[in-house]
Curated annotation (Swiss-Prot):
It holds the Pfam family Peptidase_S24. Homodimer. The gene is lexA. This is LexA repressor. It comes from Pasteurella multocida (strain Pm70). Represses a number of genes involved in the response to DNA damage (SOS response), including recA and lexA. In the presence of single-stranded DNA, RecA interacts with LexA causing an autocatalytic cleavage which disrupts the DNA-binding part of LexA, leading to derepression of the SOS regulon and eventually DNA repair. GO terms for biological process: DNA repair; DNA replication; negative regulation of DNA-templated transcription; proteolysis; SOS response. The lineage of its organism: Bacteria, Pseudomonadati, Pseudomonadota, Gammaproteobacteria, Pasteurellales.
Length: 211
């Protein structure tokens, strides 16, 4: 892959923390969380490092939200890289990666994400805007059914696919938006058998940056 501009040791620490936090929680850390984790005296120090990473093209800072940070990727030069499939509309009862659901392929190295991404899903709407997942974004997804409370998951109810924060209490699933204008989706597994967890969010890509 094309390299980013060289990072200082401290900038690399911040970048690695961003990736690790996304992997563990499905969302970027706040400035306060970065400062606490890396021992900065104030969130302002974290902000300065984030601005430096943005100038080097490694991340994008989204104003208006405390978690408005996106990791940006460089396009792979390898002809052997098959890229990641973009999943479109999904029919009930069929695998999410069935051929008829694939709208195209984006030349993104799956190994840039931890854990590895298996597919991309286009985001519709503003239900997750408070953590920087915006309408039109491409969400990188790791296929797994092994999920934890608090993770950002891709869930399927019948033929509807949604991206939400997971909370499970017994047989009841709560899918929480990151936007106070949206109520949680409540799924009782005893009454809704056509419910599947398709994976966890492992990154975000701007839709207009790739193809």
């Amino acid at each position: 892959m094309k390299p980013f501009k060289a990072l200082t040791a401290r900038q690399q620490e911040v970048y690695d923390l961003l990736k690790r936090h996304l992997e563990n929680t499905g969302m970027p850390p706040t400035r306060a969380e970065i400062s606490k984790e890396l021992g900065f005296r104030s969130p302002n120090a974290a902000e300065e490092h984030l601005k430096a990473l943005a100038r080097k093209g490694v991340i994008e800072i989204i104003s208006g939200t405390s978690r408005g940070i996106r990791l940006l990727l460089e396009e792979s030069e390898s002809d052997e890289n098959q890229g990641l499939p973009l999943v479109g509309r999904v029919a009930a009862g069929e695998p999410i990666l069935a051929e008829q659901h694939i709208e195209g392929t984006y030349q993104v190295d799956a190994n840039m994400f931890k854990p590895q991404a298996n597919f991309l899903l286009k985001v519709y709407g503003q239900s997750m805007k408070n953590i920087g997942i915006l309408d039109g974004d491409l969400l990188a997804v790791h296929s797994t059914k092994d999920v934890r409370n608090g993770q950002i998951v891709v869930a399927r109810i019948e033929d509807e696919v949604t991206v939400k924060r997971l909370e499970r209490k017994g047989s009841v699933i709560y899918l929480h938006a990151e936007n106070e204008e949206f109520a949680p989706i409540v799924v009782d597994l005893n009454q809704q058998p056509n419910f599947e967890i398709e994976g966890i969010a492992v990154g975000i890509i701007r839709n207009n940056a790739w193809m």
